[in-house]
Amino acid sequence: MSQVYNFSAGPAMLPIQVLRQMQDELLEYEDVKASIMEISHRSTDFIAMAQKSEQDLRDLMNIPNHYKVLFLQGGASAQFSMVPINLLHGKTKANYAYTGHWSKKAIVEGSRYCDVNICTNSSDNKYTDIDVFENWDIDPDGAYLHYTPNETIAGLEFDYVPEVDMPLVADMSSSILSREVDVSKYGVIYAGAQKNIGIAGLTVVIVREDLMGSVVANQPILFDYTIQAKNDSMYNTPSTYSWYVASRVFEWLKQQGGLSVIAKINQTKAKTLYDVIDGSNFYSNPVALKYRSWMNVPFLLADENLNGLFVEKAAINNLITLKGHRSVGGMRASIYNAMPQKGINELINFMKVFEKENS
């Protein structure tokens, strides 16, 4: 089978080494004589895998001991509810940065639990720029500040971490594990797994212990961080296979040399692609230079009538899932950790040929 490069925004490409390991272990996990999908989450074998996966993630991200790591369900969308449920602590306000599609979803859900103060808004520039932090309108009475470091659809990414005197909450679904992060700056970090962690069905939540223990009344017990932590993320049956895949991805990341190495690779991949876009009169990217995403690279064709042909011919060349989101148009190359430099090179070669044939 020819190598296919999948530029999907999520569920996304997995490392080929992990896919082969999944294939090898599908029918029999290690010495268990059964698939990991078939064994109890209470078994010693599954618990050993779960504990190792947590430790590997702690090692990769240098997570301090006073943070809990949870492996939950419901995707990032469930966290849009769980964050206010667990972090309001009796307050009635919270700060949210509005920089794109996913932060808007968090705002809509957060407003069901509290008064949302939108402290910065990128909708006026169509999510192509982020205001400097000094211009943000932070409500000091807010329980926390929520932001989305990387907006998957627009390809808009922060190049700074907001510094506030309140818990900082980050939806890192599309940027987690792409580089080193100082976890101690955050109260909560959460991420759906299907981009840089593994496959859909799992959500990783990293929460500072002192923020746990007080929840909005009359909410589902599964939405209580404290309950989940006390039960090692197994109050109910977890998404066992998704957890297993994440464990294999964590191992793969460590084998690559950790996040400092991965960050350099990711930065090089993104720069290589942006350089081609910027050096062309045929392709363009509207995002402000300093806020361009490493993970999601949208680009427009000079003639939008060629979009369908581009996607069709790219697929023939084993470059799939390049169609941009309907709200942006054009193309989008999502180049998460699993995408090798060779995949970027193949895309660039195709782009150059397509431009030559259609200019």
Swiss-Prot record:
Family: Belongs to the class-V pyridoxal-phosphate-dependent aminotransferase family. SerC subfamily.
Residues that bind pyridoxal 5'-phosphate: A76, S77, W102, T152, D171, Q194, N236, T237
Pathway, per record: Amino-acid biosynthesis; L-serine biosynthesis; L-serine from 3-phospho-D-glycerate: step 2/3; Cofactor biosynthesis; pyridoxine 5'-phosphate biosynthesis; pyridoxine 5'-phosphate from D-erythrose 4-phosphate: step 3/5
Gene3D superfamilies per UniProt: Aspartate Aminotransferase, domain 1, Type I PLP-dependent aspartate aminotransferase-like (Major domain)
Designated name of the protein: Phosphoserine aminotransferase
A GO MF term: O-phospho-L-serine:2-oxoglutarate aminotransferase activity
Species for this entry: Vesicomyosocius okutanii subsp. Calyptogena okutanii (strain HA)
Positions bearing N6-(pyridoxal phosphate)lysine: K195
Any one Gene Ontology cellular component term annotated for this protein: cytoplasm
Main location: cytoplasm
Keyword entries, A-Z: Amino-acid biosynthesis, Aminotransferase, Cytoplasm, Pyridoxal phosphate, Pyridoxine biosynthesis, Serine biosynthesis, Transferase
Record-listed E.C. numbers: 2.6.1.52
InterPro entries in UniProt: Aminotrans_V_dom (IPR000192), Aminotrans_V_PyrdxlP_BS (IPR020578), Pser_aminoTfrase (IPR022278), PyrdxlP-dep_Trfase (IPR015424), PyrdxlP-dep_Trfase_major (IPR015421), PyrdxlP-dep_Trfase_small (IPR015422)
Binding locations of L-glutamate: R42
